[in-house]
Amino acid sequence: MTSTAPPKVQYEAVIGLEVHVQLSTETKLFCRCSTRFGNTPNTNICPICTGQPGTLPVLNQQALDYAVLTASALNCQIHPQGLSKFDRKQYFYPDLPKNYQISQYDLPLAERGWLEIEVEGEPAKRIGITRLHMEEDAGKLVHAGADRLSGSTHSLVDFNRAGVALCEIVSEPDIRTAAEAAAYAGELRRIVRYLGVCDGNMQEGSLRFDLNISVRPAGEGKFGTKVEIKNLNSFNSLQRAVEYEFARQVDCLLSGERIVQETRLWDEATQRTISMRSKEEANDYRYFPEPDLVPIALNGTQIDAYRQRLGELPAQKRHRYRETLGLSSYDAGVLTDEREVAEYFEQVVALGIPAKQAANFVSGAVAAHLNETRRSISQIKVTPEVSAELLALINQGIISNRIANELLPDLFEKGGSPRALVEERGLTQISDRGQLEQIVDEVLAGESDSVAAYRGGRTKLLGFFVGKVMKKTAGRADPQVVNDLLQSKLAEQPTAPPPEPESAAETPEAPPAVEDAPPEAPTEAITAEAGSAEAITAASEEPDTPVSHQDAHA
């Protein structure tokens, strides 16, 4: 009798994210203390944010505006029950001076939203948002002798961050992979940066992720035991934590171990999660309404006014760039990642430059300069007007792509008018056909062996001839005119010499063998699209190897 092995169980991850968005207000949520990052410890504090007896909190109106804008952008319903209130979340920790946190519990500011994400190679997916609520941040502990509490000799507390305004955005458990988790977090970051409600600087803690993950057999409806992962301060950390924790929990199930509901810490050094404490439940925090703050009530007219302030969000821009401007999904994604870059690109297009050409220039030459100098696009001297003028000079045939490439370093350093710089240096492109024909004739006359080889089948030598002409004109020749002239002249058959007297004894010699040509480097006029990232590069002066006398007559 034969036995059949049980089929191998396939597991899937069930993931939800809690994202803490630090709102870019000048002052804290309930007091007038500064929120500036990096100040001397314990200087941005007052009796209110340090929980001194007799003080009363006052809600920051700007923080409320930012929270409602964010909720509107995430398609949330603003306090569907008609009002929203604050609650005290009770817990004891050294960086929480009041021994409670002012947060929101049963009546959050907004609920039931969604965010659409795009993962390469997969259809767009909608991730549900359970709730968005406001709360104050805690202080910060600095552990001496180690980078965390374990192993430290003592801890110092900095209350500068205590009381800073936060929005906590809780997703539905709709995420299934590490790539989806990173896409969700990335899109959320883009939205809050577009709105101007958060700078999104993860290295400063402006955007922090808590990951909730469980595993279950694929297709099963019941959830597994949830584990929370903290200390995720980058998209890479988020992805690696998902991958590690998924594998760890699957290993536990396969080995018969029980998964414990707990909070774990992501350790960047060891690339694994470490158990911190058992996971708290809501009743552990003993929530009750905050007696010192009145409920928030917004009417429909006010909520509509917030929605009208949203403007075009990243997903809407990407769709417009693809459908209206004809850009690829990749180009649309790169250009809309930051609002300033998208606005720069749109200004270049508005000045008459074709969208594809502008996209290639911004995502190519401009982006390379930004990466090299670590500047934002608003800080560079090549303004949209300068970019449009430079690209227009190329399109008008006044300069070549090669000349444009040579001008860029000076323009990035000093700014100014590209047209004036061209005139000052005498770099106007030579497009006169008669003038270029004379130069082409000189080049071909000096390369008779290579001409013979070209006519014998080595047509890839065309790039070599183009390079020679470009060298003679210091890169100023119009590559298209040069290509046309060369192809025309090389196609002409040379004038046959007068016939020699016949000799019965002579036998015609076999034609010389011509070895295969090396691969030809692309030339500017053949392959470069006007204004493309590839086009704004110098053409090779001699793209193919010239033919020596021995090569031609071997």
Curated annotation (Swiss-Prot):
GO terms (BP aspect): glutaminyl-tRNAGln biosynthesis via transamidation; translation
SUPFAM superfamilies hit by this protein: GatB/YqeY motif (SSF89095), Glutamine synthetase/guanido kinase (SSF55931)
Residue numbers spanned by region Disordered: 491-554
Keyword Ligase: yes
Domain of life of the native organism: Bacteria
An annotated Gene Ontology molecular function: glutaminyl-tRNA synthase (glutamine-hydrolyzing) activity
Top-level enzyme category: ligase
Biased composition (Low complexity): 502-540
Key words of the record: ATP-binding, Ligase, Nucleotide-binding, Protein biosynthesis
PROSITE patterns named in the record: GATB
InterPro entries registered for this protein in UniProt: Asn/Gln-tRNA_amidoTrfase_suB/E (IPR017959), Asn/Gln-tRNA_Trfase_suB/E_cat (IPR006075), Asn/Gln_amidotransferase (IPR018027), Asn/Gln_tRNA_amidoTrase-B-like (IPR003789), GatB (IPR004413), GatB_C_1 (IPR042114), GatB_Yqey_C_2 (IPR023168), Gln-tRNA_amidoTrfase_suB_CS (IPR017958)
EC number: 6.3.5.-
Catalytically driven reaction(s): L-glutamyl-tRNA(Gln) + L-glutamine + ATP + H2O = L-glutaminyl-tRNA(Gln) + L-glutamate + ADP + phosphate + H(+); L-aspartyl-tRNA(Asn) + L-glutamine + ATP + H2O = L-asparaginyl-tRNA(Asn) + L-glutamate + ADP + phosphate + 2 H(+)
Subunit annotation: Heterotrimer of A, B and C subunits.
Protein purpose: Allows the formation of correctly charged Asn-tRNA(Asn) or Gln-tRNA(Gln) through the transamidation of misacylated Asp-tRNA(Asn) or Glu-tRNA(Gln) in organisms which lack either or both of asparaginyl-tRNA or glutaminyl-tRNA synthetases. The reaction takes place in the presence of glutamine and ATP through an activated phospho-Asp-tRNA(Asn) or phospho-Glu-tRNA(Gln).
Similarity-based family: Belongs to the GatB/GatE family. GatB subfamily.
The name this protein goes by in its record: Aspartyl/glutamyl-tRNA(Asn/Gln) amidotransferase subunit B
Source organism of this protein record: Gloeobacter violaceus (strain ATCC 29082 / PCC 7421)
